[in-house]
Swiss-Prot record:
One of its GO terms (cellular component) is Golgi apparatus. This is Exocyst complex component 3. Keywords: Acetylation, Cell projection, Cytoplasm, Exocytosis, Golgi apparatus, Protein transport, Transport. PANTHER family: EXOCYST COMPLEX COMPONENT 3, EXOCYST COMPLEX COMPONENT SEC6-RELATED. InterPro entries: EXOC3/Sec6, EXOC3/Sec6_C. The lineage of its organism: Eukaryota, Metazoa, Chordata, Craniata, Vertebrata. One of its GO terms (biological process) is mitotic cytokinesis.
């Protein structure tokens, strides 16, 4: 009742919903007054739609009713069939119970049938049994003639006869070993023929890469024979599940043996490529690896293009050969890695393993694509072995670089003693071959390392810079020893100045080469940071160059010593040409120094200028002369001014092109001359004060020596000047370069000077 009530409510709701929808639809149609004229047209159209929907609904209901009627009919038929089957099963069960005793009484008949089957098999194979010796001979002849397919056909006949007889015997009396042995013995030659045929097959497979090019039919025959044997193996193993019998020599597993033979052949081919040893050829490993590369590439191309046509697809012959070659190469590379390799041999091996193997020259060759995916290949050497080789290489390379640098320096040292001048570069600067030799060696090792990996390249660069740092320290020591040796006998070496210039220039070449090396081989900021953390070599190179320049200037001033000693003496005052000789000597030396590269020549010129002025002022402070009159003071002061101008002109000439101020130092001589030239002693304090204000490093002993040189200052005046200057010490300007600081006044105390 509840169900009918719910259905009624649902129908009522549906009617109400339909009415509401209709009202809404009519309202939508009649929104304007002019649409009232079309009411009849709208009504007829809706009536047609209603009739169409009702017709489709009736057809659908009728179809559903027909389906239900058909289903009921089929269910009725199925029920009748089930009843019939049930009755038939009952009849079969009844008949089976009644026939049990009858079946047991037929056991003798069953045994007779089995015996008959065995005898029938014997009769069927009788012809083959009698012809076994003849078939054996024919098979042997065919094998020797190379007719492998025909030989295998006859071998199959022999094995089939033997296996059939033995199987029947096994079924009839599995425990009768004597009869089984008799049959096996009669067919004893069969196993020997099988082994002989197998040898021929393996020989063909061992030369398969040659055979496939010359006689692919022979290789196809071998594969067909192996495939036949595989089918026989599968059939016998299936029969074993039913009978438990397996013929002797089965399963042969010739397919498995075929892949084993191919694997051994590949291994032998890889191992047999080593034609030389280290003793007979230093490049033995490079030659060995190149032969391997060529052989493997050629073999795989042949396998891809030709061998795959001779084997069934499911053998995946190319994939298997690729795996065999890869494994054989991995084993060979491990064997080579375990040997005591030299540094260049380690590089050759790692370059081949890490780069050549996967490159377009080998596994990445377009002729092997797409079957060979280099990204899927396992590494030939494990990361641990590669790491050990790299460690060994770095250790050996370190020792080699140290030895190479030592030898290069020894060779360069021998050149320093030559009687001939060193070579000059394209700009005319003296140089030796040392920087070129050193950086050529670095370049070679870096290029080699870059072939292996970027990481190794960076490590080698760091190593080179480290060893360069140590090398430059030794270079500095050797240059110092060279200088000391020359000072012991200035006549030797003959070209001391020229080779010392070359040593100085080498420092600039080393600097430029280091910058070039870093720029070329450092690609990332991380690498640059790594190398910048290494000790800077600029300081050592500048120290070597500075020492070299100092030694050359020392050479100059040793020659000038005699003429410097003439300054501020009676001879000088009477007209000595010491300054003329000094200028000529300095200019002559600087003609040789023109072979020094610009940065160092600039510093050397400035230092020579400063030192000449210092030596001149030192002569002033040496108390070699004391002027006795105003005329002598005037004459001496004017001579000092003229000589200052001479020196100024000289060093302007030497410093041309450097942008150096060649006047500052010579102005000091002029300032001192002004103090000497002063005619009014009462103004002496003012003049000295001016001098002290310009040169704050001037000391009391310098003033005392200067006043003593004038020869006209009273003791009280000297004392007053000295005390006044002591009360107000002058402050030096930030840019002032001390010049009097180096000048030592002879050990006469101030009191004596004042007297």
């Amino acid at each position: 009742m509840c169900k009918d009530s719910a259905c009624f409510l649902t129908m009522k709701e549906t009617d109400l919903e339909a009415v509401a929808t209709a009202v809404q639809r009519v309202a939508g149609m009649l929104q304007r007054p002019d649409q009232l004229d079309k009411v009849e047209q709208y009504r007829r159209r809706e009536a047609r739609k209603k009739a169409s929907v009702e017709a489709r609904l009736k057809a659908a209901i009728q179809s559903q009713l027909d389906g239900v009627r058909t289903g009921l009919s089929q269910l009725h038929n199925a029920l009748n069939d089930v009843k019939d089957i049930q009755q038939s099963l009952a009849d079969v069960s009844k008949d089976w119970r009644q026939s049990i005793n009858t079946i047991e009484s037929l056991k003798d008949v069953k045994d007779a049938v089995v015996q008959h089957s065995q005898l029938a098999a014997a009769v069927e194979n009788l012809k083959n049994i009698f012809s076994v010796p003849e078939i054996v001979r024919e098979t042997q002849d065919l094998i020797e003639q190379g007719a492998l397919l025909q030989a295998h056909r006859k071998l199959m006949d022999l094995e089939c006869s033997r296996d059939g007889l033995m199987c029947e015997q096994y079924r009839m009396d599995s425990g009768n070993k004597r009869d089984m042995t008799l049959i096996h013995g009669y067919f004893g030659s069969t196993q020997g023929l099988s082994d002989e045929l197998a040898k021929q097959l393996w020989m063909v497979l061992q030369r398969s890469l040659v055979t496939v090019r010359r006689d692919p039919t022979l290789l196809v025959s071998v594969v067909r024979i192996i495939e036949r044997e595989e089918k026989i193996d599968r059939r016998i193993l299936d029969r074993k599940k039913q009978t438990g019998f397996v013929p002797p020599g089965r399963p042969k597993n010739w397919k498995e043996k075929m892949f084993a033979i191919l694997d051994r052949t590949v291994t032998t081919r890889i191992e047999g490529t080593q034609a030389d040893t280290r003793e007979s050829d230093k490049m033995w490993l490079v030659r060995h690896l190149e032969i391997i590369r060529k052989y493997v590439l050629d073999d795989l191309i042949v396998a891809k293009n030709l061998m795959v046509q001779c084997f069934p697809p499911h053998y995946e012959i190319f994939k298997n050969l690729l795996s065999m070659y890869h494994q054989a190469l991995s084993t060979r590379m491990q064997d080579l890695a375990s040997e005591d390799l030299e540094a260049n041999e380690i590089v050759s091996l790692l370059t081949w393993v890490l780069n050549t193997y996967t490159s377009a020259e080998m596994m990445g060759n377009v002729e092997l694509a797409p079957e060979v995916d280099v990204s899927a290949l396992e590494p030939l050497l494990s990361p641990n072995i590669v790491s050990e080789l790299l460690d060994t290489y770095m250790s050996t390379l370190t020792s080699n670089i140290i030895a190479w640098l030592r030898k290069a320096l020894e060779t360069d040292k021998k050149d320093w003693s030559k009687e001939t001048e060193p070579e000059a570069d394209q700009d005319g600067y003296y140089q030796t071959t040392l920087p070129a030799i050193v950086f050529q060696m670095f370049e070679q090792n870096l290029q080699v390392a870059a072939q292996i990996s970027e990481d190794l390249k960076t490590k080698v660069l760091v190593l080179c810079l480290q060893q360069m740092n140590s090398f430059l320290s030794r270079y500095k020591d050797e240059a110092q020893l060279y200088k000391e040796e020359h000072l012991r006998n200035r006549q030797h070496p003959h070209c001391y100045v020229q080779y010392m210039i070359a040593i100085i220039n080498n420092c600039q070449t080393f600097k430029e080469s280091i910058i070039s090396l870093k720029r070329k081989y450092l690609k990332t900021e991380a690498e640059e940071g790594l190398c910048l953390s290494q000790p800077s070599m600029d300081g050592i190179l500048d120290a070597i160059a500075k020492e070299g320049c100092s030694s050359l200037l020392e050479e100059v001033f040793l020659d000038l010593e005699q003429h410097l000693n003439e300054l501020m003496t009676k001879k000088w005052l009477l007209g000595s040409n010491a300054v003329d000789i000094i200028c000529v000597t300095v200019e002559d030396y600087f003609n040789d120094f023109a072979k020094i590269k610009k940065p160092y020549k600039k510093r050397m010129t400035a230092e020579a200028h400063r030192r000449v002025v210092v030596e001149y002022l030192r002569a002033v402070m040496q108390k070699r002369i004391s002027f006795r009159s105003a005329e002598e003071r005037k004459e001496g002061a004017e001579k000092m001014v003229r000589e200052a101008e001479q020196l100024r002109f000289l060093f302007r000439k030497l410093a041309s092109g450097f942008g150096e101020d060649a006047d500052g130092h010579c102005d000091t001589i002029v300032a001192v001359a002004e103090v000497i030239k002063l005619t009014d002693p009462s103004l002496l304090y003012l003049e000295v004060s001016t001098l002290v204000s310009k040169y704050p490093d001037i000391r009391d002993d310098h003033i005392g020596a200067l006043l003593a040189l004038r020869g006209d200052a009273s003791r009280d005046m000297k004392q007053t000047i000295m005390e006044t200057l002591e009360q107000g010490p002058m402050q030096a300007s930030p840019n002032y370069v001390p010049i009097f600081k180096e000048i030592v006044v002879p050990s006469l105390n101030v009191a004596k000077l004042l007297k």
